Amino acid sequence: MIIDFKKYSSVRIGNEFEVLVLDQICDFDGFLIGGANNLLVSPKPKNIGILGDGFNFIQILDRNKDFIHLRIGCKTKSSKMYRFAKENNLKGFEYLSKIPGTLGGLLKMNAGLKGECISQNLIKIATSQGEILRANINFDYRFCPLNTHFFWAEFKLNFGFDTLKDEALKNARSNQPSGASFGSIFKNPKNDFAGRLIEAVGLKGFSKGDAMLSDKHANFLINKKNASFEDAFFLIELARKKVFEEFGTNLENEVIII
């Protein structure tokens, strides 16, 4: 299938490329995309694949009075997982109301919010290399060590959807800028914030072409209208360079560049 990444990706940057649809668990020599919410696509990306619709599902494997055991396809959107948890009175997915993307992408970056993350209720992941138990995966902050493709995952959730947490999360990320963006450019370094460092070196609101380091939150890159890959990449590398020169801190990408 052909995907126009200027329309498909959240930052609205990219060209049209042929994307291979994977309808079953298999090896694939390339990059597997999800919702393209934290993705910047270059003019010459490597092979791109996407999961077929057969991996968009939530299946109940077991349930009792205390918990429910789910298998979820990695093309399933976070919003669908959140709604399922809320409708079935399940605890542990409340934060997904504020994190866009598909399950595969969430697992790849161990996505989370307010001290919670997608790996916390995980049992195992089905990959192109076989099924891998959570106990054998060394997740860390915004990090998953597995360099393979994900197809479905299983979770164990307790009952008791947290309505207070859900309400509190409604104001989470209210400081984030609007507009076409891939979210945070960099991971926060330990005991600091990437946005603070970028602002401290004078780059908050700095533009190159139609790409801008947001004047509301410096760790966000905004496509004002028709930003190019080159403009966006220039700003990312400029911010990294300036912060390292000033503070000796090497900012690590949260955005994935292919």
From Swiss-Prot:
The entry's keywords: Cell cycle, Cell division, Cell shape, Cell wall biogenesis/degradation, Cytoplasm, FAD, Flavoprotein, NADP, Oxidoreductase, Peptidoglycan synthesis
InterPro entries cross-referenced by the UniProt entry: FAD-bd_PCMH-like_sf, FAD-bd_PCMH_sub2, MurB, MurB_C, MurB_C_sf
Active site: residue positions: R142, S184, E254
Disulfide links within the chain: none
Signal peptide: none
GO biological process annotation, one example: cell wall organization
Known catalytic reactions: UDP-N-acetyl-alpha-D-muramate + NADP(+) = UDP-N-acetyl-3-O-(1-carboxyvinyl)-alpha-D-glucosamine + NADPH + H(+)
GO terms for MF: flavin adenine dinucleotide binding; UDP-N-acetylmuramate dehydrogenase activity
Pfam families noted in UniProt: MurB_C (PF02873)
Pathways per UniProt: Cell wall biogenesis; peptidoglycan biosynthesis
Required cofactor(s): FAD
GO CC terms, sorted: cytosol
EC number per UniProt: 1.3.1.98
Organism superkingdom: Bacteria
Subcellular location: Cytoplasm
Entries under PANTHER family matching the protein: UDP-N-ACETYLENOLPYRUVOYLGLUCOSAMINE REDUCTASE
Role description: Cell wall formation.
Protein family (similarity comment): Belongs to the MurB family.
UniProt-recorded name of the protein: UDP-N-acetylenolpyruvoylglucosamine reductase
